[in-house]
């Protein structure tokens, strides 16, 4: 439902530009906005507004948890409430800024995916620090700076997800139905979620501020074993 509504929002509120700026930390809303953007046939831009400016990019839409994290030059801007269950922005919105939760409710729960070429760019990680993809719930391996590509086409992202799943046994039938995804990096988190989904498993995403007690509770409640 959320992905369809976001895809409708993206399509209605913006025209294709350099991408949709998802200026959000690891969070279920980050997953929803990235996947909704892909459903709409658009590219996702990760990183801060500073990263966007430094790269000389002009996103068609900028989404963030705080006003100062938005890209002011974007065609449209939306603030998303950080509270997981919130259905609207908690306060007064800045002028011309949309509510990235309440304003989604106007859009249908169904959206026909936009056909997009496999070689089209789907993800630009402007804040990449050279962390290699890791299996769901594990720590990313350290690789030389710059070894992780900052730009991925749809075909490349699919290949990376398939490779990660095959190398880590993500589809192991004896594993629990849920996977704990705990990464401080949004791009890494997205890939771990996609690996879990491809294996038919549920991804339990922890936000960066979640401590070990929260992680232990999630593992216990979801019955996560591997």
What is the predicted function of each stretch?
Residues 6-14, 33-37, 56, 66, ...:
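Hydrophobic, Leu/Ile/Phe/Ala-enriched alpha-helical segments that form helix-helix packing faces
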Residues 2-22, 51-54, 154-180, 225:
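ANL superfamily AMP-binding
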């Amino acid at each position: 439902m959320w992905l369809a509504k976001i895809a409708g929002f993206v399509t209605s509120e913006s025209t294709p530009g350099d991408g949709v700026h998802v200026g959000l930390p690891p969070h279920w809303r980050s997953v929803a906005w990235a996947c909704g953007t892909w459903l709409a046939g658009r590219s996702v831009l990760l990183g801060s507004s500073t990263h966007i400016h430094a790269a000389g990019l002009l996103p068609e839409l900028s989404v963030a948890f705080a006003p100062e994290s938005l890209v002011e030059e974007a065609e449209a801007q939306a603030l998303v409430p950080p509270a997981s269950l919130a259905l609207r922005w908690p306060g007064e919105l800045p002028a011309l800024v949309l509510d990235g939760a309440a304003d989604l409710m106007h859009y249908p729960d169904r959206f026909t995916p936009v056909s997009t070429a496999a070689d089209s760019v789907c993800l630009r990680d402007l804040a990449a620090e050279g962390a290699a993809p890791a299996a769901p719930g594990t720590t990313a391996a350290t690789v030389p700076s710059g070894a992780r590509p900052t730009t991925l086409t749809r075909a490349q992202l699919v290949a990376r997800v398939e490779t990660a799943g095959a190398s880590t046994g993500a589809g192991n039938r004896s594993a629990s139905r849920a996977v704990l995804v705990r990464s401080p990096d949004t791009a890494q988190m997205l890939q771990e979620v996609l690996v879990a989904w491809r294996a038919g498993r549920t991804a339990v995403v922890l936000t960066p501020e979640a401590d070990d007690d929260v992680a232990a509770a999630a593992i216990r409640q979801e019955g996560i074993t591997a």
